[in-house]
């Protein structure tokens, strides 16, 4: 098998196998070929991973942030040196085109290790509070053992986005990737230990929906960070609440992308395509509700149709390929069902709408699809599809589109395209979302916070803000004189 790892799990600095666990077959989405066979973690494996993390964490926390940071920066360097290898693995794991993974996946993970490795001494500083002759100070302290639960759209990136702030803050982590994409996180663990990370601090275990509760409910776990769907987030948050664990939730979205009639239409079309078709539409922050002002709707759709139909669908390992398969057969079937629902409910099919005929074999392909004349009550305008399906809705004025854009249970992200920057800032101020873009879309450098509101989750990934979610404040009051007691 072309991507078989040394073993299913990485615990305490080494690969570990336990064949008693349920078999997990990793399939290459372009062909359906089995490329690796692993085993889900048994309760014994879960205990082994958490115990290793618990043992290793105190000594790691006692190191200076600068010393911890040096290791993370070495890991970033190794990831960049091995970018091609890691990118090809990510393509095999997810089906995303190599032209994407080579610029967006391992590199963004390396960015996270480099950023947190370099800025932590400043980000973890406390404060000094003068109180007359007395004073107080605060310091940030680690939480302990953190659990990261990843999604299947950006497996390597997510492992790094969670691992980097957790580790630099002095924590240990047990990371569980999605069973659909089990391979990348193992390589991240291997690289971290090659960079000098002490044993037990970053452990990877495989599993499915039965494994998560073993991690979330474990008494030695202090924090859970999940990237996943809203239903999964609700279950995890409810379980974590029972023992008052710290929680970060990065969940789904049905985000609005608003195009005003003064926008640069070519840029707006490009932004809409990036916000719907990148990674075959499997991006939580996608702007899948594209609101276009009526005066430019026809021209917008004309340009969008031409560019969408020109996209090259094919073998993800071919660098010319622009759109690859869905991650799994089940996800492809789900997306096809939504496309049929859009047709049945009266939306106008502009482009795509089915399975491409230029690919052969058992791959999980879907054409990039555009619907126009979509109304707010249609299923494709309300529910997260997580595939390459764009809904174009029209609008008359600013107040109307803001009201409609906010009429969603989700609040992850949104975007505005307009030449009027005063209007752009006015609109984003009123949009109910955690991450917003003006005249661009879906750019998420590690320097900026990323996260949502409403049913799209809470807490933030990336930037110095992430350190607040992997540490807590300790306050110390220092008395400088005799105690004045009334007793």
UniProtKB/Swiss-Prot annotation:
Cofactor: K(+)
UniProt GO MF annotations: betaine-aldehyde dehydrogenase (NAD+) activity; metal ion binding
Natural source organism: Rhizobium etli (strain ATCC 51251 / DSM 11541 / JCM 21823 / NBRC 15573 / CFN 42)
Entry protein name: Betaine aldehyde dehydrogenase
Binding residue positions for K(+) 1: 26, 93
Enzyme class: oxidoreductase
CDD domains reported in the protein's UniProt record: ALDH_F9_TMBADH
Function field: Involved in the biosynthesis of the osmoprotectant glycine betaine. Catalyzes the irreversible oxidation of betaine aldehyde to the corresponding acid.
One Pfam family this sequence matches: Aldedh
Location of the active site: 162, 250, 284, 461
UniProt keywords, alphabetically: Metal-binding, NAD, NADP, Oxidation, Oxidoreductase, Potassium
Pathway(s) served: Amine and polyamine biosynthesis; betaine biosynthesis via choline pathway; betaine from betaine aldehyde: step 1/1
């Amino acid at each position: 098998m072309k991507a078989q790892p040394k073993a299913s799990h990485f615990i305490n600095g080494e690969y570990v196998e336990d064949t008693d666990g349920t078999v997990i077959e990793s399939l290459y989405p372009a062909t359906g070929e089995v490329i690796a066979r692993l085993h889900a973690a048994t309760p014994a494996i879960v205990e082994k991973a958490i115990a290793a993390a618990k043992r290793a964490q105190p000594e790691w926390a006692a190191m200076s942030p600068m010393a911890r940071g040096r290791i993370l920066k070495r890991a970033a360097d190794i990831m960049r040196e091995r970018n091609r290898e890691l990118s090809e693995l990510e393509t095999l794991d997810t089906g995303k085109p190599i032209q994407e993974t080579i610029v967006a996946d391992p590199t963004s993970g390396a960015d996270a290790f480099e950023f947190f490795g370099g800025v932590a001494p400043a980000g973890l500083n406390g404060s000094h509070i003068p109180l007359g002759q007395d004073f107080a100070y605060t310091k940030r302290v680690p939480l302990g053992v953190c659990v990261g639960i990843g999604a299947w759209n950006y497996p390597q990136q997510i492992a790094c986005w969670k691992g980097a702030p957790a580790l630099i803050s002095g924590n240990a982590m047990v990371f569980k990737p999605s069973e659909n994409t089990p391979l990348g996180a193992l390589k991240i663990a291997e690289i971290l230990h090659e960079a000098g990370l002490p044993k037990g601090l970053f452990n990877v275990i495989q599993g499915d929906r039965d494994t998560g509760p073993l991690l979330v409910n474990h008494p030695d776990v202090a924090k859970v960070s999940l990237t996943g769907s809203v239903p999964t987030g609700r279950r995890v948050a409810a379980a974590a609440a029972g023992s008052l664990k710290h929680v970060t939730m990065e969940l789904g979205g049905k985000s609005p992308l608003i195009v005003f009639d003064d926008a640069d239409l070519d840029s707006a079309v490009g932004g809409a395509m990036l916000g719907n078709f990148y990674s075959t539409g499997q991006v939580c922050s996608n702007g899948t509700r594209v609101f276009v002002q009526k005066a430019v709707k026809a021209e917008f759709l004309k340009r969008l149709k031409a560019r969408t139909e020109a996209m090259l669908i094919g073998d993800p390992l071919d660098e010319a390929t622009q759109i690859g398969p869905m991650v799994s057969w089940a996800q492809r079937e789900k997306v096809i069902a939504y496309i049929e629902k859009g047709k049945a409910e009266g939306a106008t099919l502009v482009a795509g709408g089915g399975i491409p005929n230029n690919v052969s074999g058992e791959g999980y392909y879907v054409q990039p699809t555009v619907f126009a004349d979509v109304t707010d009550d249609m299923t494709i305008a309300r529910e997260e599809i997580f595939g390459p399906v764009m809904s174009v809705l029209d609008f008359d004025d600013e107040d109307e589109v803001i009201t409609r854009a906010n009429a969603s249970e989700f609040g992850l992200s949104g975007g505005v395209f307009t030449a009027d920057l005063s209007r752009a800032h006015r609109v984003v101020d009123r949009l109910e979302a955690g991450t917003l873009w003006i005249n661009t879309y879906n750019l998420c450098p590690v320097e900026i916070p990323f996260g949502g509101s409403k049913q799209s989750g809470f807490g933030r990934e990336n930037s110095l803000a992430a350190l607040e979610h992997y540490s807590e404040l300790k306050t110390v009051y220092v008395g400088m004189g005799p105690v004045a007691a009334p007793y």
